[in-house]
Amino acid sequence: MASKTIEIFFFDAGGGHRNAMHALSQQLSQRHPDWIITPVDLQALLEPIDPVNRLTRRLTGSLNRLLLPVAPNVKLPPWQAQDIYNSALKRGTTRGLGAILPILQGFVRRYQPEIEQILVDRWRDPATPRPDLVLSVIPNFNRVMFCALRAFAADIAYATVITDMVDYPPHFWMEDQDQVMICGTPKAAKQARATGFYVEDKIFEVSGMILKDAFYRPAQPGGPTRAGLGLAPDRPTALIMFGGNGSFRATQTILGQFEKAGLGIQSIVMCGKNTRLLDSLKDRPGCHPVGFVNNVADYMRIADFFIGKPGPGSLSEAVHMGCPVIIERNANTLPQERANVEWVRDNGLGIVVRSFRADLAGAGARMVRDLANYKANIAANIPENRAVFE
């Protein structure tokens, strides 16, 4: 087969989009070593028109000039729009984040001509190999990206991999345009058909969310063990994870509630890039903090259950590794993640609480008591996730 050039557009709001990009890039490169696989960070491309970046660039520029005489080595970077989302997750709050969605979609509408021009100019650049396929793993921008691609060339295929369990219309994942839609759940595929936007042979249903290759590899010699982490081999063990930036507030709440209840639950905390969280847990009994690592699967393998945010990626990873889940569902749950909670409830994959602070002690006791039942539900109700290979 002749060599192909594939572009995968992603951004870093939350981390799941980058994970999907890496997983797809790795598989495509392994199967087709002669293909050119190019990840494209859309946020970086759009930085010149990002209003958050413009504002913070002006503010940090002034502050950096003031700091120069007294702290010449301190340099405050400007923010990108996605940093607002990631900062909120790091603080452990999603309150108000639902309001970001209409603001973001308004930005896309307002700046559509400028966004299209940036994309077209990139594709027209002689240094950019002409793609055979443009693949998107991001929501909200698929209309403007498709229009830009068609302005550049009429014969280049466009596909979207939905990294949520369902669409959240309008103008979130699905748009009225001639493209391929790759859906990770029967409900998302049903939504795609119901729109009437796509012909049947351009709707593909795969067996789940995109997971990294590490979640399919067997345990490796020398991998983490409970004893090696300073934990008791026979005590119930929770893996606590709130994405690549961790969550100080939520994690401290969870650990405090477990300690207060005296349930004997120990924990592995995936802190990601949150060094404040990592440092705060280093001497905490019955708790092993882990910084930013690429082998999350190895830590899930030695945990009994998962506690965290109801994101589609982390839930899918936990369930794939056989870990039942404890998650929150309340007014602060992001609109596009509410369907993930229903997926957990409908399939008996774990426990949904309204508040970690108020309800976690009871949920933890119930999880320990009924752990075997939840694991049996995972085995019976969830097909093996082979999506990245499919």
Model-found features: residue ranges?
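Donor-nucleotide binding loops and adjacent catalytic segments primarily
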Residues: 222-224, 229-302
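Conserved N-terminal ligand/cofactor-binding loop architecture of enzyme catalytic domains
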Residues: 23, 29-120
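A short, Lys/Arg-enriched amphipathic alpha-helix followed by its capping loop at the start of a domain
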Residues: 23-35, 152, 257-263
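Catalytic binding pocket for nucleotide-activated donors in carbohydrate/polymer assembly enzymes
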Residues: 315-362
